[in-house]
């Protein structure tokens, strides 16, 4: 199965659902960035690796900020939450398509 084609279609559908939302809304921005990434990559393994990294983005960011910066207002970032959620949904979508 070609993950690039499957995910590209999935993301385009998701973006069409968000067509009337501001371009900088966290979910739309994360989907747009993922679509850009898919345009640059060809390997299924690289796509899965990127999604796994993205799925932990919010947790890793909080851990890093906690260690080096005491400003708790930076811990909850809507964009990184959206990135993590979309990556998890995409991985789940790919898993369901495989079966």
Residue ranges and their predicted role:
Residues 16-28, 41-48, 62-74, 99:
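Charged, low-complexity interaction regions
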Residues 7, 11, 31-34, 51, ...:
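Generic L/I/V-rich hydrophobic alpha-helical segments across diverse proteins
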Residues 2-5, 38-46, 93-97:
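Alpha-helix capping and inter-helical loop/turn segments
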Residues 26-33, 37, 45, 78, ...:
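Alpha-helical oligomerization interfaces
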Residues 1-33:
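Short terminal alpha-helical segments
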Residues 11, 39-43, 55-62:
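Short alpha-helix boundary/capping elements
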Residues 58-99:
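Amphipathic alpha-helical binding modules
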């Amino acid at each position: 199965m070609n993950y690039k084609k499957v995910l590209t279609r999935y993301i385009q559908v998701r973006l069409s659902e968000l067509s009337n939302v501001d371009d900088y809304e966290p979910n739309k921005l994360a989907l747009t960035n993922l679509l850009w990434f898919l345009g640059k990559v060809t390997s299924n393994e690289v796509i899965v690796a990127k999604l796994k990294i993205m799925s932990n983005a919010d947790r890793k960011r909080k851990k890093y900020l906690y260690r080096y910066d005491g400003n708790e207002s930076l811990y909850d970032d809507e964009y990184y939450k959206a990135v993590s959620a979309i990556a998890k949904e995409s991985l789940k979508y790919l898993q369901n398509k495989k079966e």
